[in-house]
């Protein structure tokens, strides 16, 4: 696809006429936009809800504050939503000038190890302008299916363990990590992050450690502990994280609760034994119980080349409800 059109449309119009900074006390228009597709927009909403204040231009709207057609978080990474339009909801696509203006705005705000992520069609729209302006990618992941967990009477975990009763100890051990267990959780989180993104996040300073601690404090980091050898940890015995999953994004939207799982990880020596599936099924139930309600949506996204993970999710009944893309910088 050619993005030369960005150069030809509206270059004489000031960028400020295309983008509207969203103050932290005037988010209702953006939230209404996101409510049209809460599963796809939950990452953007998470950022706006986590921070009570932000700098001018950290959140921007396209099309005005009251009824924007698109919006984006632009601090270190870029999270766009709505650029490609949502005709089923009567929303037009952002025009070429608006998309170029967003790319120009975000370009100087992207960090060395940031990303552009969100619905694949929205990422594709803005990435063309960014690349034209000289932004280079470390890795492009254009097919990341968004999957949603099924609603199962009696709970997904219980239904799964009826098929795998030998793993009952796993499902029964799933719980939110405690603050005094942060030192146990952090190495597992770092291993997951390093394997997924290719570098140790702790080398960039204390930010990642703070994020892991924050998730634990919010009761959004779920773990299974074992004795280090794939057996239930007994009182007084050594303990290790066998499995973990985080609620990376969370929103109680007008149409119901939505959670997005991130950081799903099974310790390498335990993979292929069914432990990950048993634990994840129990996590889905726990997230509904603790955060989004019985009818809430629990979703995640996965690289399409991660065949083992896709097989695991589908074995539990997860179904595709969207498509994300991530461009790593």
What are these language model-derived features?
Residues 1-44, 158-202:
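Short amphipathic alpha-helix that is part of the acyltransferase structural core
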Residues 2-8, 67-68, 75-170, 327:
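Acyl-donor-binding surface of acyltransferase catalytic domains
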Residues 12-15, 21-22, 32-38, 46-115, ...:
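Conserved donor-binding loop and adjoining core beta-sheet/short helix segment
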Residues 73-79, 198, 206-262, 267:
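Acetyl-CoA-dependent GNAT
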Residues 92-105, 262-268, 272-289, 310-315:
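Conserved acetyl-CoA-binding loop-helix of GNAT-fold acetyltransferases
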Residues 110-120, 257, 287-302, 324:
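Conserved GNAT acetyl-CoA-binding A-motif
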Residues 121-140, 277, 304-322:
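Conserved active-site alpha-helix within GNAT-family acetyltransferase domains
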């Amino acid at each position: 696809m050619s993005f030369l059109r960005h150069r030809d449309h509206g270059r004489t119009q000031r960028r400020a006429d295309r983008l509207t900074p969203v103050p932290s006390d005037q988010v209702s228009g953006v939230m209404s936009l996101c409510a049209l597709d809460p599963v796809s927009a939950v990452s953007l909403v998470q950022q706006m809800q986590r921070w009570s204040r932000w700098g001018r231009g950290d959140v921007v709207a396209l099309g005005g504050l009251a009824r924007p057609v698109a919006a984006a978080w632009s601090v270190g990474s870029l999270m766009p939503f709505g650029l490609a339009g949502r005709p089923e909801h009567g929303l037009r696509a952002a025009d070429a000038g608006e998309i170029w203006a967003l790319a120009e705005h975000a370009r100087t705000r992207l960090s060395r190890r940031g990303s552009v992520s969100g619905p694949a069609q929205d990422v594709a729209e803005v990435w063309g302008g960014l690349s034209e302006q000289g932004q280079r990618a470390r890795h492009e992941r254009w097919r990341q299916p968004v999957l949603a967990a099924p609603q199962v009477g009696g709970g997904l975990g219980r239904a799964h363990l009826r098929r795998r009763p030998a793993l009952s100890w796993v499902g029964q051990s799933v719980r939110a990590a405690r603050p005094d267990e942060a030192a146990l959780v952090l190495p597992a989180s770092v291993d997951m992050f390093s394997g997924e993104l290719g570098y140790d996040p702790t080398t960039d300073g204390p930010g990642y450690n703070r994020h892991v601690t924050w998730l634990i404090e919010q009761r959004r980091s779920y773990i299974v502990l074992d004795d280090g050898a794939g057996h239930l940890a007994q009182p007084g015995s050594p303990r290790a994280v066998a499995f973990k999953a985080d609620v990376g994004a969370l929103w109680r939207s007008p149409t119901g609760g939505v959670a997005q799982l991130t950081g799903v990880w099974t310790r390498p020596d335990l993979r292929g034994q069914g432990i990950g599936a048993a634990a994840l099924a129990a996590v889905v139930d726990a997230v509904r119980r603790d955060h989004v309600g019985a009818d809430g949506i629990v979703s995640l996204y996965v690289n399409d080349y991660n065949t083992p993970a896709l097989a695991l999710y589908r074995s539990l009944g997860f179904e595709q409800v969207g498509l994300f893309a991530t461009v790593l910088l």
